[in-house]
A protein has these predicted regions:
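Helical element adjacent to the flavin cofactor pocket in flavoenzyme catalytic cores
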Residues: 129-156, 160-179, 219, 225
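Glycine-rich active-site loop/strand segments that organize a redox cofactor
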Residues: 59-91
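Long, amphipathic alpha-helical stalk/connector segments used for oligomerization, subunit docking
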Residues: 400-488
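Core beta-strand elements of the Rossmann-like FAD/NAD(P) dinucleotide-binding domain
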Residues: 8-11, 174-184, 362
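N-terminal Rossmann-like FAD-binding beta1-loop-alpha1 element of flavoenzymes
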Residues: 13-39
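Glycine-rich FAD pyrophosphate-binding loop
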Residues: 31-53
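Glycine-rich loop(s) and the adjacent beta-strand/alpha-helix scaffold that form part
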Residues: 187-246, 381-394
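Mobile, glycine/GP-rich and aromatic-enriched active-site lid/loop segments adjacent to catalytic centers
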Residues: 104-155, 231-380, 385, 452-568
Length: 568
Protein backbone atom coordinates (compact mmCIF):
# COMPACT_ATOMS: atom_id res chain seq x y z
CA UNK A 1 0.00 0.00 0.00
CA UNK A 2 1.13 3.56 -0.69
CA UNK A 3 -0.10 7.11 -0.09
CA UNK A 4 -2.32 7.75 -3.11
CA UNK A 5 -3.57 11.29 -2.49
CA UNK A 6 -1.92 14.40 -1.14
CA UNK A 7 -3.93 17.41 0.02
CA UNK A 8 -2.67 20.85 1.00
CA UNK A 9 -5.19 22.93 2.94
CA UNK A 10 -5.04 26.50 4.22
CA UNK A 11 -6.90 28.02 7.16
CA UNK A 12 -6.55 30.87 9.61
CA UNK A 13 -6.72 28.64 12.70
CA UNK A 14 -6.05 24.91 12.96
CA UNK A 15 -7.38 23.08 16.01
CA UNK A 16 -5.74 19.70 16.52
CA UNK A 17 -8.13 17.57 18.57
CA UNK A 18 -11.89 17.96 18.57
CA UNK A 19 -12.44 17.10 22.21
CA UNK A 20 -13.71 19.33 25.00
CA UNK A 21 -11.14 22.15 24.73
CA UNK A 22 -10.97 22.03 20.93
CA UNK A 23 -14.71 22.25 20.37
CA UNK A 24 -15.16 25.04 22.90
CA UNK A 25 -12.28 26.98 21.33
CA UNK A 26 -13.99 26.75 17.94
CA UNK A 27 -17.23 28.14 19.39
CA UNK A 28 -15.32 31.04 20.94
CA UNK A 29 -13.38 31.83 17.76
CA UNK A 30 -16.60 32.07 15.79
CA UNK A 31 -18.22 34.29 18.45
CA UNK A 32 -15.26 36.68 18.32
CA UNK A 33 -14.37 36.64 14.62
CA UNK A 34 -14.96 35.30 11.14
CA UNK A 35 -11.56 33.60 10.81
CA UNK A 36 -11.60 30.25 9.05
CA UNK A 37 -11.20 27.16 11.23
CA UNK A 38 -10.19 23.56 10.59
CA UNK A 39 -10.66 20.99 13.35
CA UNK A 40 -8.54 17.87 12.82
CA UNK A 41 -9.94 14.97 14.85
CA UNK A 42 -8.52 11.44 15.06
CA UNK A 43 -11.92 9.91 15.85
CA UNK A 44 -15.26 11.68 15.33
CA UNK A 45 -16.04 14.81 17.30
CA UNK A 46 -19.49 13.55 18.24
CA UNK A 47 -18.00 11.04 20.69
CA UNK A 48 -14.30 11.76 21.02
CA UNK A 49 -11.95 12.67 23.83
CA UNK A 50 -12.36 12.25 27.57
CA UNK A 51 -15.95 13.47 27.40
CA UNK A 52 -17.01 10.77 24.92
CA UNK A 53 -19.16 8.77 27.35
CA UNK A 54 -20.32 11.81 29.30
CA UNK A 55 -20.06 12.68 32.98
CA UNK A 56 -22.56 12.88 35.83
CA UNK A 57 -21.10 15.96 37.50
CA UNK A 58 -19.30 19.20 36.75
CA UNK A 59 -16.24 18.67 38.95
CA UNK A 60 -14.86 22.20 38.66
CA UNK A 61 -17.45 24.81 39.59
CA UNK A 62 -17.54 27.75 42.00
CA UNK A 63 -20.54 26.80 44.13
CA UNK A 64 -22.60 29.26 46.14
CA UNK A 65 -20.58 30.75 48.99
CA UNK A 66 -17.23 30.06 47.32
CA UNK A 67 -15.00 32.17 45.10
CA UNK A 68 -12.38 31.45 42.40
CA UNK A 69 -9.55 32.00 44.88
CA UNK A 70 -10.86 29.04 46.91
CA UNK A 71 -10.51 26.75 43.91
CA UNK A 72 -6.97 27.97 43.29
CA UNK A 73 -6.11 27.26 46.93
CA UNK A 74 -7.56 23.74 46.68
CA UNK A 75 -5.63 22.87 43.50
CA UNK A 76 -2.42 24.38 44.87
CA UNK A 77 -2.68 22.38 48.08
CA UNK A 78 -3.43 19.14 46.23
CA UNK A 79 -0.30 19.64 44.08
CA UNK A 80 1.78 20.65 47.12
CA UNK A 81 2.54 24.06 45.69
CA UNK A 82 3.88 23.12 42.25
CA UNK A 83 1.32 24.95 40.12
CA UNK A 84 1.06 28.04 37.95
CA UNK A 85 -1.27 30.20 40.01
CA UNK A 86 -1.84 32.63 37.13
CA UNK A 87 -3.20 29.75 35.02
CA UNK A 88 -5.33 28.42 37.87
CA UNK A 89 -6.77 31.85 38.58
CA UNK A 90 -7.70 32.66 34.99
CA UNK A 91 -9.23 29.20 34.66
CA UNK A 92 -11.20 29.42 37.92
CA UNK A 93 -12.65 32.80 36.96
CA UNK A 94 -14.24 31.25 33.87
CA UNK A 95 -15.63 27.98 35.26
CA UNK A 96 -19.16 29.22 35.89
CA UNK A 97 -19.24 31.19 32.66
CA UNK A 98 -18.63 28.13 30.47
CA UNK A 99 -21.08 26.10 32.57
CA UNK A 100 -23.79 28.67 31.89
CA UNK A 101 -22.96 28.48 28.19
CA UNK A 102 -23.29 24.69 28.20
CA UNK A 103 -26.67 24.94 29.92
CA UNK A 104 -27.84 27.32 27.20
CA UNK A 105 -26.68 24.78 24.60
CA UNK A 106 -28.85 22.11 26.22
CA UNK A 107 -26.92 20.53 29.09
CA UNK A 108 -29.25 19.43 31.90
CA UNK A 109 -28.02 20.66 35.30
CA UNK A 110 -29.90 19.27 38.29
CA UNK A 111 -31.66 21.83 40.48
CA UNK A 112 -33.34 21.74 43.88
CA UNK A 113 -36.83 22.94 44.78
CA UNK A 114 -35.52 26.51 44.95
CA UNK A 115 -34.06 26.40 41.46
CA UNK A 116 -30.47 26.27 42.75
CA UNK A 117 -27.91 23.90 41.26
CA UNK A 118 -27.55 20.69 43.28
CA UNK A 119 -24.04 20.74 44.71
CA UNK A 120 -21.93 17.64 45.34
CA UNK A 121 -19.28 18.77 47.79
CA UNK A 122 -17.50 22.13 47.69
CA UNK A 123 -16.64 22.29 43.99
CA UNK A 124 -19.08 20.04 42.11
CA UNK A 125 -22.61 20.23 40.76
CA UNK A 126 -24.74 17.34 39.49
CA UNK A 127 -25.74 17.09 35.84
CA UNK A 128 -27.29 14.68 33.38
CA UNK A 129 -24.22 14.74 31.20
CA UNK A 130 -24.24 11.59 29.08
CA UNK A 131 -24.84 13.72 25.98
CA UNK A 132 -22.43 16.52 26.85
CA UNK A 133 -20.03 15.83 23.97
CA UNK A 134 -22.79 15.48 21.35
CA UNK A 135 -24.13 18.85 22.55
CA UNK A 136 -20.73 20.43 21.93
CA UNK A 137 -20.30 18.68 18.59
CA UNK A 138 -23.75 19.77 17.42
CA UNK A 139 -22.94 23.39 18.27
CA UNK A 140 -19.69 23.15 16.31
CA UNK A 141 -21.48 21.63 13.31
CA UNK A 142 -23.58 24.79 13.00
CA UNK A 143 -20.59 27.14 12.76
CA UNK A 144 -19.91 28.84 9.44
CA UNK A 145 -16.49 28.43 7.80
CA UNK A 146 -15.52 25.75 10.32
CA UNK A 147 -14.39 22.53 8.63
CA UNK A 148 -14.26 19.36 10.73
CA UNK A 149 -12.01 16.63 9.35
CA UNK A 150 -12.77 13.43 11.23
CA UNK A 151 -10.57 10.33 11.16
CA UNK A 152 -7.34 12.22 10.48
CA UNK A 153 -4.20 11.46 12.49
CA UNK A 154 -1.94 14.50 12.89
CA UNK A 155 1.68 13.39 13.30
CA UNK A 156 3.94 16.45 13.10
CA UNK A 157 3.93 20.21 13.42
CA UNK A 158 5.29 22.44 10.68
CA UNK A 159 7.65 24.78 12.54
CA UNK A 160 9.94 27.36 10.93
CA UNK A 161 12.20 29.59 13.04
CA UNK A 162 10.30 28.56 16.17
CA UNK A 163 7.00 29.71 14.64
CA UNK A 164 4.12 27.34 13.94
CA UNK A 165 3.03 27.09 10.31
CA UNK A 166 0.63 24.15 10.47
CA UNK A 167 0.78 20.37 10.70
CA UNK A 168 1.06 17.12 8.74
CA UNK A 169 -1.16 14.09 9.07
CA UNK A 170 -2.94 11.29 7.24
CA UNK A 171 -6.45 9.95 6.89
CA UNK A 172 -7.16 6.75 8.79
CA UNK A 173 -9.79 5.71 6.25
CA UNK A 174 -8.05 6.26 2.91
CA UNK A 175 -4.50 6.68 1.64
CA UNK A 176 -4.43 10.48 1.86
CA UNK A 177 -1.63 12.57 3.34
CA UNK A 178 -2.46 16.09 4.54
CA UNK A 179 -0.51 19.28 4.93
CA UNK A 180 -2.60 21.88 6.75
CA UNK A 181 -1.14 25.39 6.73
CA UNK A 182 -2.42 27.78 9.40
CA UNK A 183 -1.61 31.16 10.93
CA UNK A 184 -2.35 29.93 14.45
CA UNK A 185 -2.59 26.39 15.84
CA UNK A 186 -4.29 25.13 18.99
CA UNK A 187 -3.13 21.78 20.33
CA UNK A 188 -5.96 20.09 22.24
CA UNK A 189 -5.03 16.43 21.83
CA UNK A 190 -5.42 15.29 25.44
CA UNK A 191 -2.92 13.50 27.66
CA UNK A 192 -1.10 10.17 27.42
CA UNK A 193 -2.39 6.73 28.38
CA UNK A 194 -0.79 3.38 27.65
CA UNK A 195 2.75 4.27 28.72
CA UNK A 196 2.69 1.78 31.60
CA UNK A 197 1.41 -1.76 31.93
CA UNK A 198 -2.30 -1.42 32.83
CA UNK A 199 -4.33 -3.02 35.64
CA UNK A 200 -6.03 -5.54 33.37
CA UNK A 201 -4.18 -7.72 30.83
CA UNK A 202 -4.99 -9.02 27.36
CA UNK A 203 -8.42 -8.33 25.93
CA UNK A 204 -9.29 -6.04 28.87
CA UNK A 205 -6.13 -3.93 28.74
CA UNK A 206 -8.12 -0.89 27.61
CA UNK A 207 -10.40 -1.06 30.65
CA UNK A 208 -8.55 1.85 32.16
CA UNK A 209 -9.14 5.22 33.76
CA UNK A 210 -8.01 7.43 30.87
CA UNK A 211 -8.99 7.03 27.19
CA UNK A 212 -6.57 4.51 25.62
CA UNK A 213 -6.80 6.47 22.36
CA UNK A 214 -5.12 9.51 23.95
CA UNK A 215 -1.54 8.54 23.22
CA UNK A 216 0.36 11.75 23.91
CA UNK A 217 0.38 12.97 20.29
CA UNK A 218 0.37 16.64 21.24
CA UNK A 219 3.10 16.18 23.82
CA UNK A 220 5.27 14.23 21.37
CA UNK A 221 4.88 16.73 18.53
CA UNK A 222 5.76 19.56 20.88
CA UNK A 223 8.74 17.75 22.37
CA UNK A 224 10.20 16.94 18.94
CA UNK A 225 9.65 20.54 17.80
CA UNK A 226 11.52 21.99 20.77
CA UNK A 227 8.60 23.30 22.83
CA UNK A 228 9.28 23.68 26.54
CA UNK A 229 7.42 21.15 28.70
CA UNK A 230 6.75 21.18 32.43
CA UNK A 231 6.21 18.85 35.39
CA UNK A 232 6.03 15.48 33.59
CA UNK A 233 7.23 13.97 36.87
CA UNK A 234 3.82 14.73 38.40
CA UNK A 235 2.15 11.64 37.01
CA UNK A 236 -1.50 10.93 37.70
CA UNK A 237 -2.66 7.69 39.30
CA UNK A 238 -6.38 7.31 39.81
CA UNK A 239 -7.88 5.51 42.80
CA UNK A 240 -10.59 3.30 41.29
CA UNK A 241 -12.96 0.44 41.99
CA UNK A 242 -10.96 -2.75 41.56
CA UNK A 243 -11.18 -4.59 38.21
CA UNK A 244 -13.92 -2.39 36.75
CA UNK A 245 -11.72 0.75 37.08
CA UNK A 246 -14.95 2.65 37.80
CA UNK A 247 -14.84 6.05 39.58
CA UNK A 248 -14.60 6.10 43.36
CA UNK A 249 -15.67 9.71 43.86
CA UNK A 250 -19.33 8.93 43.29
CA UNK A 251 -19.23 6.53 46.24
CA UNK A 252 -16.96 8.62 48.46
CA UNK A 253 -18.89 11.84 47.94
CA UNK A 254 -22.31 10.40 47.15
CA UNK A 255 -22.70 8.27 50.27
CA UNK A 256 -19.77 9.52 52.36
CA UNK A 257 -17.86 6.23 52.14
CA UNK A 258 -14.48 6.16 53.92
CA UNK A 259 -11.37 4.26 52.85
CA UNK A 260 -10.92 1.24 55.11
CA UNK A 261 -8.50 -1.69 55.25
CA UNK A 262 -9.31 -5.38 55.70
CA UNK A 263 -9.47 -4.86 59.47
CA UNK A 264 -12.20 -2.27 59.04
CA UNK A 265 -9.91 0.57 60.09
CA UNK A 266 -10.31 3.97 58.42
CA UNK A 267 -6.85 4.75 57.04
CA UNK A 268 -7.38 7.78 54.80
CA UNK A 269 -6.68 10.31 57.57
CA UNK A 270 -3.47 8.45 58.46
CA UNK A 271 -1.76 9.30 55.16
CA UNK A 272 -3.54 12.47 54.06
CA UNK A 273 -6.42 13.43 51.81
CA UNK A 274 -4.74 14.80 48.70
CA UNK A 275 -5.21 12.80 45.51
CA UNK A 276 -1.73 11.26 45.63
CA UNK A 277 -1.96 10.54 49.38
CA UNK A 278 -5.20 8.58 48.94
CA UNK A 279 -3.43 6.32 46.43
CA UNK A 280 -0.29 6.10 48.58
CA UNK A 281 -2.27 5.09 51.65
CA UNK A 282 -3.92 2.26 49.75
CA UNK A 283 -0.54 1.05 48.47
CA UNK A 284 1.01 1.11 51.95
CA UNK A 285 -1.89 -0.65 53.65
CA UNK A 286 -1.54 -3.49 51.15
CA UNK A 287 2.25 -3.62 51.50
CA UNK A 288 2.00 -3.79 55.28
CA UNK A 289 -0.44 -6.69 55.20
CA UNK A 290 -3.69 -4.88 55.92
CA UNK A 291 -5.19 -5.24 52.46
CA UNK A 292 -7.38 -5.49 50.53
CA UNK A 293 -8.61 -1.93 50.85
CA UNK A 294 -12.18 -0.78 50.35
CA UNK A 295 -14.65 2.06 50.29
CA UNK A 296 -16.96 1.29 53.21
CA UNK A 297 -20.46 0.98 51.80
CA UNK A 298 -21.78 -1.74 54.08
CA UNK A 299 -24.82 -0.47 55.94
CA UNK A 300 -25.88 2.30 53.55
CA UNK A 301 -29.62 2.70 52.99
CA UNK A 302 -31.68 0.99 50.24
CA UNK A 303 -32.19 4.42 48.67
CA UNK A 304 -28.42 4.92 48.52
CA UNK A 305 -28.05 1.44 47.00
CA UNK A 306 -30.45 2.39 44.24
CA UNK A 307 -28.74 5.74 43.70
CA UNK A 308 -25.31 4.11 43.26
CA UNK A 309 -26.60 1.42 40.90
CA UNK A 310 -28.23 4.05 38.69
CA UNK A 311 -25.24 6.39 38.79
CA UNK A 312 -22.80 3.68 37.69
CA UNK A 313 -25.17 2.25 35.10
CA UNK A 314 -24.98 5.68 33.49
CA UNK A 315 -21.20 6.21 33.54
CA UNK A 316 -19.48 2.87 34.34
CA UNK A 317 -21.97 0.02 33.69
CA UNK A 318 -19.47 -2.71 34.56
CA UNK A 319 -19.59 -1.70 38.23
CA UNK A 320 -23.36 -2.07 38.40
CA UNK A 321 -23.09 -5.37 36.52
CA UNK A 322 -20.49 -6.54 39.04
CA UNK A 323 -22.94 -5.91 41.89
CA UNK A 324 -25.68 -7.74 39.98
CA UNK A 325 -23.38 -10.67 39.17
CA UNK A 326 -22.32 -10.98 42.82
CA UNK A 327 -25.94 -10.86 43.95
CA UNK A 328 -25.00 -8.24 46.53
CA UNK A 329 -25.81 -4.56 46.76
CA UNK A 330 -23.18 -2.02 47.89
CA UNK A 331 -24.87 -2.01 51.31
CA UNK A 332 -24.01 -5.71 51.68
CA UNK A 333 -20.41 -5.64 50.51
CA UNK A 334 -17.69 -2.99 50.66
CA UNK A 335 -16.24 -1.89 47.30
CA UNK A 336 -12.62 -2.95 46.82
CA UNK A 337 -10.28 -0.24 45.46
CA UNK A 338 -6.88 -0.04 43.76
CA UNK A 339 -4.63 2.43 42.00
CA UNK A 340 -4.36 2.52 38.22
CA UNK A 341 -1.19 2.64 36.17
CA UNK A 342 0.34 6.14 35.88
CA UNK A 343 -0.83 8.58 33.21
CA UNK A 344 0.44 11.95 32.01
CA UNK A 345 -2.55 14.25 32.02
CA UNK A 346 -2.49 18.01 32.53
CA UNK A 347 -6.16 18.19 33.42
CA UNK A 348 -5.53 16.50 36.77
CA UNK A 349 -1.85 17.23 37.43
CA UNK A 350 0.44 20.03 36.23
CA UNK A 351 2.16 18.13 33.40
CA UNK A 352 2.18 19.42 29.83
CA UNK A 353 3.22 22.34 27.67
CA UNK A 354 4.82 25.31 29.40
CA UNK A 355 2.47 28.13 28.40
CA UNK A 356 2.02 31.82 29.08
CA UNK A 357 -1.12 33.15 30.76
CA UNK A 358 -2.93 33.20 27.39
CA UNK A 359 -1.98 29.51 26.85
CA UNK A 360 0.56 30.16 24.11
CA UNK A 361 3.49 27.73 24.14
CA UNK A 362 7.15 28.62 23.63
CA UNK A 363 6.62 28.00 19.89
CA UNK A 364 5.18 31.25 18.52
CA UNK A 365 1.58 30.89 17.39
CA UNK A 366 1.12 27.44 18.94
CA UNK A 367 -1.35 27.27 21.83
CA UNK A 368 -2.26 24.43 24.19
CA UNK A 369 -5.50 23.81 26.10
CA UNK A 370 -7.00 21.07 28.22
CA UNK A 371 -5.10 17.95 29.26
CA UNK A 372 -2.15 18.80 27.02
CA UNK A 373 -1.46 22.14 28.76
CA UNK A 374 0.72 22.13 31.87
CA UNK A 375 0.85 24.11 35.09
CA UNK A 376 -2.88 24.06 35.81
CA UNK A 377 -4.16 20.90 37.52
CA UNK A 378 -7.74 20.01 38.49
CA UNK A 379 -9.21 21.39 35.23
CA UNK A 380 -11.76 18.68 34.58
CA UNK A 381 -14.28 19.36 31.79
CA UNK A 382 -15.08 23.00 32.50
CA UNK A 383 -11.44 23.95 33.02
CA UNK A 384 -10.57 22.51 29.61
CA UNK A 385 -13.33 24.62 28.10
CA UNK A 386 -12.04 27.77 29.79
CA UNK A 387 -8.53 27.12 28.49
CA UNK A 388 -9.92 26.63 24.98
CA UNK A 389 -11.74 29.94 25.37
CA UNK A 390 -8.67 31.80 26.66
CA UNK A 391 -6.50 30.47 23.83
CA UNK A 392 -9.17 31.28 21.24
CA UNK A 393 -9.53 34.88 22.41
CA UNK A 394 -5.77 35.45 22.26
CA UNK A 395 -5.43 33.85 18.82
CA UNK A 396 -8.17 36.10 17.48
CA UNK A 397 -6.59 39.14 19.13
CA UNK A 398 -3.17 38.37 17.61
CA UNK A 399 -4.67 37.80 14.16
CA UNK A 400 -6.61 41.07 14.44
CA UNK A 401 -3.36 42.88 15.22
CA UNK A 402 -1.46 41.26 12.34
CA UNK A 403 -0.65 43.94 9.76
CA UNK A 404 0.73 41.60 7.08
CA UNK A 405 -1.16 41.21 3.81
CA UNK A 406 -2.08 37.61 4.63
CA UNK A 407 -0.28 36.06 1.68
CA UNK A 408 1.44 32.70 2.33
CA UNK A 409 5.10 32.98 3.33
CA UNK A 410 5.83 29.59 1.75
CA UNK A 411 5.54 29.04 -1.99
CA UNK A 412 3.17 26.45 -3.41
CA UNK A 413 6.21 24.59 -4.75
CA UNK A 414 7.84 24.40 -1.31
CA UNK A 415 4.57 23.31 0.30
CA UNK A 416 4.20 20.51 -2.24
CA UNK A 417 7.82 19.47 -1.75
CA UNK A 418 7.37 19.33 2.03
CA UNK A 419 4.26 17.17 1.74
CA UNK A 420 6.06 14.82 -0.67
CA UNK A 421 8.76 14.30 1.94
CA UNK A 422 6.23 13.58 4.68
CA UNK A 423 4.28 11.20 2.41
CA UNK A 424 7.54 9.33 1.75
CA UNK A 425 7.93 8.87 5.50
CA UNK A 426 4.43 7.40 5.71
CA UNK A 427 5.15 5.20 2.67
CA UNK A 428 8.19 3.75 4.43
CA UNK A 429 5.92 2.10 7.00
CA UNK A 430 3.36 1.13 4.34
CA UNK A 431 5.99 -0.76 2.32
CA UNK A 432 5.76 -4.48 3.02
CA UNK A 433 8.91 -5.99 4.50
CA UNK A 434 9.91 -8.80 6.86
CA UNK A 435 9.61 -7.63 10.45
CA UNK A 436 10.87 -9.26 13.62
CA UNK A 437 8.43 -7.41 15.87
CA UNK A 438 4.87 -6.16 15.61
CA UNK A 439 3.64 -2.78 16.81
CA UNK A 440 1.71 -4.49 19.59
CA UNK A 441 4.78 -6.44 20.74
CA UNK A 442 6.89 -3.28 21.03
CA UNK A 443 4.04 -1.52 22.83
CA UNK A 444 3.86 -4.34 25.38
CA UNK A 445 7.64 -4.22 25.79
CA UNK A 446 7.47 -0.46 26.39
CA UNK A 447 4.79 -0.90 29.03
CA UNK A 448 6.81 -3.63 30.75
CA UNK A 449 9.92 -1.42 30.81
CA UNK A 450 8.01 1.51 32.30
CA UNK A 451 6.23 -0.74 34.79
CA UNK A 452 9.44 -2.39 36.02
CA UNK A 453 11.90 0.50 35.90
CA UNK A 454 9.95 3.78 35.94
CA UNK A 455 7.57 3.33 38.85
CA UNK A 456 4.63 1.27 37.64
CA UNK A 457 2.08 -0.86 39.48
CA UNK A 458 4.43 -3.84 39.96
CA UNK A 459 6.96 -1.71 41.89
CA UNK A 460 4.25 0.07 43.90
CA UNK A 461 4.95 3.23 41.86
CA UNK A 462 8.48 3.46 43.31
CA UNK A 463 11.75 3.98 41.41
CA UNK A 464 15.40 4.92 41.85
CA UNK A 465 18.07 6.45 39.65
CA UNK A 466 19.57 3.19 38.44
CA UNK A 467 16.16 1.91 37.42
CA UNK A 468 15.45 5.10 35.49
CA UNK A 469 18.79 4.79 33.67
CA UNK A 470 17.82 1.27 32.59
CA UNK A 471 14.39 2.49 31.54
CA UNK A 472 15.96 5.17 29.33
CA UNK A 473 18.35 2.68 27.73
CA UNK A 474 15.60 0.17 27.00
CA UNK A 475 13.13 2.76 25.67
CA UNK A 476 15.79 4.12 23.31
CA UNK A 477 16.35 0.59 22.01
CA UNK A 478 12.63 0.17 21.40
CA UNK A 479 12.58 3.46 19.50
CA UNK A 480 15.24 2.03 17.17
CA UNK A 481 13.08 -1.04 16.55
CA UNK A 482 10.10 1.04 15.41
CA UNK A 483 11.94 1.96 12.21
CA UNK A 484 11.31 -1.51 10.77
CA UNK A 485 7.59 -1.73 11.54
CA UNK A 486 5.12 -2.40 8.74
CA UNK A 487 1.51 -1.26 8.39
CA UNK A 488 -0.81 -3.06 5.98
CA UNK A 489 -3.34 -0.20 6.00
CA UNK A 490 -3.85 3.34 7.29
CA UNK A 491 -5.33 2.16 10.57
CA UNK A 492 -2.21 0.15 11.34
CA UNK A 493 -0.13 3.16 10.32
CA UNK A 494 -1.95 5.12 13.03
CA UNK A 495 -0.97 2.43 15.57
CA UNK A 496 2.71 2.83 14.60
CA UNK A 497 2.57 6.58 15.11
CA UNK A 498 0.71 6.19 18.41
CA UNK A 499 3.52 3.90 19.58
CA UNK A 500 6.16 6.40 18.47
CA UNK A 501 4.31 9.15 20.36
CA UNK A 502 4.20 7.10 23.55
CA UNK A 503 7.89 6.25 23.34
CA UNK A 504 8.77 9.94 22.95
CA UNK A 505 6.67 10.82 25.99
CA UNK A 506 8.22 7.95 27.98
CA UNK A 507 11.69 9.47 27.60
CA UNK A 508 10.43 12.81 28.92
CA UNK A 509 8.70 11.14 31.87
CA UNK A 510 11.89 9.25 32.75
CA UNK A 511 13.99 12.43 32.52
CA UNK A 512 11.59 14.41 34.70
CA UNK A 513 11.26 11.67 37.33
CA UNK A 514 15.04 11.67 37.69
CA UNK A 515 15.41 15.44 37.66
CA UNK A 516 13.20 16.17 40.69
CA UNK A 517 15.41 14.95 43.51
CA UNK A 518 12.77 14.64 46.20
CA UNK A 519 9.48 12.86 46.88
CA UNK A 520 6.91 15.63 46.92
CA UNK A 521 3.96 13.52 45.79
CA UNK A 522 3.83 10.00 47.18
CA UNK A 523 3.09 7.41 44.48
CA UNK A 524 2.86 10.06 41.76
CA UNK A 525 6.67 10.46 41.99
CA UNK A 526 8.03 8.09 44.66
CA UNK A 527 11.81 8.55 44.37
CA UNK A 528 13.54 6.00 46.63
CA UNK A 529 16.88 7.81 46.31
CA UNK A 530 15.25 10.94 47.72
CA UNK A 531 12.37 9.78 49.96
CA UNK A 532 11.89 13.15 51.66
CA UNK A 533 10.48 16.49 50.56
CA UNK A 534 12.74 19.54 50.28
CA UNK A 535 12.02 23.26 50.04
CA UNK A 536 14.91 23.43 47.58
CA UNK A 537 12.56 21.81 45.06
CA UNK A 538 9.79 24.38 45.34
CA UNK A 539 10.34 25.06 41.65
CA UNK A 540 9.16 23.96 38.23
CA UNK A 541 11.07 21.17 36.54
CA UNK A 542 10.88 21.86 32.80
CA UNK A 543 12.55 20.39 29.72
CA UNK A 544 13.32 21.21 26.11
CA UNK A 545 14.47 18.84 23.37
CA UNK A 546 17.43 20.27 21.44
CA UNK A 547 19.99 18.61 19.17
CA UNK A 548 18.80 15.12 20.00
CA UNK A 549 18.91 15.61 23.77
CA UNK A 550 16.46 16.58 26.51
CA UNK A 551 17.77 19.55 28.47
CA UNK A 552 16.32 20.20 31.92
CA UNK A 553 15.28 23.73 32.87
CA UNK A 554 14.47 24.86 36.41
CA UNK A 555 12.18 27.85 36.93
CA UNK A 556 11.09 29.70 40.05
CA UNK A 557 7.45 29.56 41.14
CA UNK A 558 5.21 32.34 39.85
CA UNK A 559 2.51 34.38 41.56
CA UNK A 560 -1.26 34.38 41.27
CA UNK A 561 -1.90 37.86 39.94
CA UNK A 562 1.08 38.32 37.63
CA UNK A 563 0.62 37.57 33.93
CA UNK A 564 3.39 35.34 32.63
CA UNK A 565 5.07 35.87 29.27
CA UNK A 566 7.87 33.82 27.71
CA UNK A 567 11.14 35.75 27.91
CA UNK A 568 13.78 33.05 27.42
Amino acid sequence: MKIENKKILHTDILIIGGGTAGCYAALTIREKSDYSIIIAEKANIKRSGCLAAGVNAINAYIVKGRKPEDYVDYAKKDADGIVREDLLMTMSEGLNRVTDKMEKLGLVILKDENGEYVARGNRNIKINGENMKPILAEAVSKLTDCTVINRINITDYIVENNTIKGAYGFSIEDATAYEIRAKKVLCATGGAAGLYRPNNPGFSRHKMWYPPFNTGAGYAMGIRSGAEMTTFEMRFIALRCKDTIAPTGTIAQGVGAKQVNSLGEVYETKYGLTTSERVYGTVMENLEGRGPCYLRTEGISPQQDESLRKAYLNMAPSQTLKWVEAGKNPSEQNVEIEGTEPYIVGGHTASGYWVNTERETTIHGLYAAGDVAGGCPQKYVTGAMVEGEIAAIDMVSKLDADTSDGSPDTSAFDEKKALEAKASEYDHFLTERPQMFTTEAIEEAMQKVMDNYAGGISTHYQFNGKQLALAKEKINHLIELTGDLYASDMHELMFIYELKERLTVCLSVIAHLGARKETRWHSFAENLDYPGKSDDWMKYVNSRYENGQLHMIYRELGGREARYEHND
